Amino acid sequence: MSRTVFCRKYQKELEGLAMPPMPGPKGQDIYENVSKLAWEEWQNQQTMLINEKHLNLMDVNNRKYLQAQMERFFNNEPFDQAEGYVPPEK
């Protein structure tokens, strides 16, 4: 059986990640408080931001920018999205 977490983004119990997505305290926080669904959605948003804004992940400022956008995404705060992106209708 998969583990569940109380997801920070969706404010309900959902399937959790199998392992922390990154090392350190930030990875552990995501592992304990973010659902698999929210993480997968963030990965899609992150990819669009990297491509749209031509982010170089070797640049510490770009990594800090993505970290800040990730926090905003998981906390349901306004976050930058790719220009012209229209979410699919559900």
Swiss-Prot record:
Keywords: Iron
A molecular function (GO) term: iron ion binding
Biological process per Gene Ontology, one example term: cellular response to oxidative stress
SUPFAM superfamilies from the UniProt entry: YggX-like
Magnesium in keyword set: no
Hydrolase as UniProt keyword: no
GO cellular component, one term: cytosol
Family, similarity comment: Belongs to the Fe(2+)-trafficking protein family.
Cited function: Could be a mediator in iron transactions between iron acquisition and iron-requiring processes, such as synthesis and/or repair of Fe-S clusters in biosynthetic enzymes.
Protein name: Probable Fe(2+)-trafficking protein
Species assigned in the record: Marinobacter nauticus (strain ATCC 700491 / DSM 11845 / VT8) (Marinobacter aquaeolei)
